[in-house]
Each structure stands twice: as structure tokens, then as C-alpha cells.
């Protein structure tokens, strides 16, 4: 899962991009495997290429822009080739260029068969990325809309029911 709060929950800001990317992999290996410099270099180069991360992946993540931090966070979980990817507010706090790059990463994941669940308060983001939209209101599921049913009006009518009980 890629959390909404990348700085507080998703990344170790003092560590480099490459180390952050390999942390879940190292944790899954237990004591059997340590991260080597060769692995760091390979992970950094692959992340720069696959996720268009700008700057050196040797720098602490804290020194990267918000968009590049978010791409590092995506790379961190995608390196494990998940079957399901949950993204909570995937583009919060990033610039328009980084948003477009992140959307492309999400679309490529879906095209490879990864089930992608996007939690977002940005309606345009939801409409642009989704095949189906589950609309909630008051902590309860209201309806699941198919791609053909999804419009901003339909979503808002379900999310903010006015005068209906």
C-alpha cells in the first residue's frame, strides 16, 4: 500500500532513494540477504529509468521534490511486482508534471494486470484513472459505478445526497 502521508509513513527521508526502494525487498528476505552497493546502484538506475526520478538516487529522499519522492514511494512497492496495489491519494502535494507521470505509472500497472485501487478525494483523478468507482458517503458504500455510468454529476449525487435519507 502506498500511503497518503509519504513523509510520515511511506519513506525514510534520511535514506537514499535506492535504499528506500530496496527496504521492502530486504525485509522479505530476512537475515539471508543484505543490500550490497551493486544492488543499490542497479535499483537506483532502474528507478531513474522506469519512474523518471530526477536527480541522484544516492541523495537522501528529503532532498528530492515532492513529485520525485512520490515516484520513489511507488518504485518502493512496485519493485516487488504486486498483484494488488492500493494507492491512497497518490498525487497529493505534487506538481502537474509529476501527476501526469504518476498517472502513466498507474496505467502501466493496470495494463500489466495489477489490480489498482485508488483512494482519492480528487474527482478528476478518479474519473481519469478508474474502470469502476465505488462511491461512499457517511462511511458507507453507496454504489459501484461502471465506467459508462461514471460522471462527475453521478458521483457527486451519490457522495453528497441532498434531501435524501
Name these PLM-found stretches.
Residues 1-165:
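Glycine-rich phosphate-binding loops of nucleotide-dependent enzymes
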